[in-house]
Amino acid sequence: MVDFGALPPEINSARMYAGPGSASLVAAAQMWDSVASDLFSAASAFQSVVWGLTVGSWIGSSAGLMVAAASPYVAWMSVTAGQAELTAAQVRVAAAAYETAYGLTVPPPVIAENRAELMILIATNLLGQNTPAIAVNEAEYGEMWAQDAAAMFGYAAATATATATLLPFEEAPEMTSAGGLLEQAAAVEEASDTAAANQLMNNVPQALQQLAQPTQGTTPSSKLGGLWKTVSPHRSPISNMVSMANNHMSMTNSGVSMTNTLSSMLKGFAPAAAAQAVQTAAQNGVRAMSSLGSSLGSSGLGGGVAANLGRAASVGSLSVPQAWAAANQAVTPAARALPLTSLTSAAERGPGQMLGGLPVGQMGARAGGGLSGVLRVPPRPYVMPHSPAAG
């Protein structure tokens, strides 16, 4: 606190009279009263709404959550309104203290007149005749000093007491929680994903059907563009179907490769019949690949892929597709009689192993329908060369 007693009355009086006065304090008190009144009205309105939630038509868990969220805010408005009202009252106390100090402060003109009188008395005090008057003047100035100091000390004490009872204002409580905001965002995202999935389920079949059967006047690029926009966000199921089709085609290619390998192996045993059987099997495999590609193209990747376990034909320890046995029937329906062996004509039966149409006896005797095209060279007669010595 400032030591107002050490300051002359000229400074204290000048400070008190140079200020704006108590008008600003009175205006501030009125504004605080208005704020307090508005807060009380808002708190009352909020409280009535909260009470209506518990007894009105909106009753349930949502109403309970609303009451729990709004009640702290209503309490805060009531407390803040009381603090605003107290602030207005204390501002009025400070304004009253100012008015009191202002009334007790010696007006600056009076102090200036006293000082001017003192200077005159000193200037005319040639023989000491003004000494009593100078003493009286100094006593009056001392009283002015003490009066201004007392007024300032009283004003400082009153304002300190008024401001000491004021409490700091608190911020409004949060009516929403971070967890609730996160749950809301998760719910919105889940709803968006569900809507997108439903839209995909509804749009993909129609788009595929339109792509398979394009109408006149519509360019393929527009169809493909619309299909891509529809399918692009959710390409995983279609990618899986394409992958399954590729796997099936890869298996077919592997079968063709195995057929070519078997062809090379059998060329040394039965060149003509084996080559014909393997060529027929390879053609069947190619036709199977073509039918697979056409079925996938016509159904818009909608056709299923079928597979059987334990249904393959066998060549020794090698498992081969069933189509190879069917292709082998075209080589020779039944083995012919073997004139140079003890084997008789074999009756035509169902498809057996891959070498069922290539009798071993025929290969040994160089006879049979499957090997009828083998070149036979008759023995050539030996001609004795003519000797020059014989003449």
From Swiss-Prot:
SUPFAM superfamilies: PE/PPE dimer-like. One of its GO terms (cellular component) is cell surface. It comes from the Bacteria. Its main location: secreted. GO terms for biological process: response to host immune response. The N-terminal region is responsible for interaction with TLR2. It is also important in mediating tyrosine phosphorylation of SOCS-3. Could be a crucial virulence factor for intracellular survival of M.tuberculosis. Favors development of Th2-type response, and down-regulates the pro-inflammatory and Th1-type response. Specifically interacts with the human Toll-like receptor 2 (TLR2), leading to an early and sustained activation of p38 MAPK, which induces IL-10 production and activates Th2-type immune response. Also inhibits pro-inflammatory cytokines IL-12p40 and TNF-alpha production. This is PPE family protein PPE18. It comes from Mycobacterium tuberculosis (strain ATCC 25618 / H37Rv).
